[in-house]
C-alpha cells in the first residue's frame, strides 16, 4: 500500500501502521456520546441506624415495591452493603434519592453501565 509504513519490533515482528486510527477527539466524542445514554441508578447503602423492617417499609411505600421485592432489596442492602433500588432518567432517580433521604435512608445516584 502506498504511503504505509512498516516497523519491525525487537522480536522481528512487522508492525504495520496502514490502518487508520481515530484521533483523540473522535475517541472522546464516542465516549461522551455513549455515557450520556446510560441510565441513572439510585443506590441505597447499608447503615447502622435503620431497622430492616423499616427499610422494607420505605421501599414499599416510597418506591412502590411489593413486600416480597422490598424484602429482597433490603436483604441485598443488609448482606452486600448496597442495592440498586431504581433506575431511569436522571430527574426520576434524583427524586427517588431525595424521597429516600427524607425517609432517613442513605442513598446516592450514579450513571450506570
Swiss-Prot record:
InterPro entries: ClpS (IPR022935), ClpS_core (IPR003769), Ribosomal_bL12_C/ClpS-like (IPR014719)
Pfam families reported in the protein's UniProt record: ClpS
Taxonomy, superkingdom: Bacteria
GO term, biological process aspect, one: proteolysis
Subunit organization: Binds to the N-terminal domain of the chaperone ClpA.
Family per record: Belongs to the ClpS family.
Described purpose of this protein according to its UniProt entry: Involved in the modulation of the specificity of the ClpAP-mediated ATP-dependent protein degradation.
NCBIfam families reported in the protein's UniProt record: PRK00033.1-1 (NF000668)
HAMAP family linked to this entry: ClpS
Protein name in the entry: ATP-dependent Clp protease adapter protein ClpS
Species whose genome carries this gene: Corynebacterium diphtheriae (strain ATCC 700971 / NCTC 13129 / Biotype gravis)
Taxonomic lineage from the root: Bacteria, Bacillati, Actinomycetota, Actinomycetes, Mycobacteriales
